[in-house]
Amino acid sequence: MGAIVLVAIMALVASSSAFSDDEQNMMNAEGEKGIRSYSAADDVSDMIESLFVNSGNRNLVLMMLSGRPQPNARCVEDGQPCGFLVSDKGCCLPNYCSQYARGKCICVPKGQPCGLLHFCCLGLTCDGSFQGTCN
């Protein structure tokens, strides 16, 4: 199951970088000029386009691949280097990797923003699933 998910995520990353510069420039120009007619179908296509074109989403996928420990694997301790260019191991819970390529294992302290990939330090909880504050 985990291998299937990994292959799907890697396909998403590969396909998101497959667009040529010309296609990207055309999409940017279209968005700036506002030459669209909107409908429910447009909203869905915009969402799908965003998943494949937006480099922020590609970075999010890479962070997900590098930031979490695998079952029964040794993990990277708090404050130690992490990321897919540094180690094949994820950070120990509740830490996450501060950058997907080369970062440090950190956690979110009390009163700071937390969410989907930014976990609160031990003993704290996030009051939101995607955007919240550590309490």
Curated annotation (Swiss-Prot):
Gene Ontology cellular-component terms listed: extracellular region
UniProt keyword annotations, A-Z: Disulfide bond, Ion channel impairing toxin, Knottin, Neurotoxin, Plant defense, Secreted, Signal, Toxin, Voltage-gated sodium channel impairing toxin
Compartment(s) of residence: Secreted
Tissue-level expression: Expressed in trichomes, that are stiff epidermal hairs located on the surface of petioles and leaves.
Residue pairs linked by disulfide bridges in the UniProt entry: C75-C92, C82-C97, C91-C105, C107-C121, C114-C126, C120-C134
Residues cleaved off as propeptide: 19-72
Signal peptide interval: 1-18
Keyword Ubl conjugation on entry: no
GO MF entries: sodium channel regulator activity; toxin activity
Presence of the UniProt keyword Nuclease in the record: no
Coiled-coil annotated spans: none
GO biological processes: defense response
Domain remarks: The presence of 'disulfide through disulfide knots' structurally defines this protein as a knottin. This toxin contains 2 'disulfide through disulfide knots'.
Its job: Plant defense neurotoxin that causes pain and systemic symptoms in mammals via modulation of voltage-gated sodium channels (Nav). Potent modulator of human Nav1.5/SCN5A (EC(50)=55 nM), Nav1.6/SCN8A (EC(50)=0.86 nM), and Nav1.7/SCN9A (EC(50)=208 nM), where it shifts the activation threshold to more negative potentials and delays fast inactivation. Also shifts the voltage-dependence of steady-state fast inactivation of Nav1.6/SCN8A, but not that of Nav1.5/SCN5A or Nav1.7/SCN9A. On Nav1.7/SCN9A, principally acts by binding to extracellular loops of domain IV (Nav site 3).
Family under the similarity heading: Belongs to the urticatoxin-2 family.
Name of the protein this chain belongs to: Beta/delta-urticatoxin-Ui2a
